[in-house]
Amino acid sequence: QIKGKLSANQIEGDIVKTVSKSFPRTNSYASGTITVRISDDQKFDRQVMIPPVLFRGGKHENFNSNNQQSYWYSTCRLRVTRNGQEIFNQSTTDVQGVFSSVIDMPAGQGTLTLTFTVSSSGANDWTPTTSISDLLVVVMKKSTAGISIS
C-alpha cells in the first residue's frame, strides 16, 4: 500500500487511466458539453482512446385531425473538437451515429483539450427524444512493450 504520490517513468508493463462521464440531459433529450483536459505532465508519449460513443435521434408517429398518419423526426448532433479544431460533426435522426478515435499525445506539446457537444432538436420545434451513450476516455503510455503483432 502506497500512501501519497508515486512517480515512475521507467515502468515495465502497462499503465492505463480511464475516466467516464454521462452526457447532460434535459428531460427526454441529450443536450450539453463535456470538456476533457489531459495535462502534458509526463515525460513519455501517450495515446488517448475514445471507445465508441453511440448517439441517435428518433422517428415519431403523428396523426392529424383527419386521422392521417405522418412522421416527424428528432435529430441528435455530436460535435467534437481537439484543441479548438473540429474533428467530428455529425447529426442523425433514426439511424445510430458513432464517434470513436485514437489520438496521439507526444510529450512536451502541451495540454490536450477535447470538447464534446451534444445537441438535440425536433421538427416543428417539438420536444425531441434523443439518446447518447456515456463518454469513456482511456489514456495510456504509447508503447509496444510485450506486444507483437504480425
Which positions does each model-derived feature cover?
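Extracellular jelly-roll beta-sandwich "head" domains, especially the C-terminal globular C1q domain
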Residues: 18-150
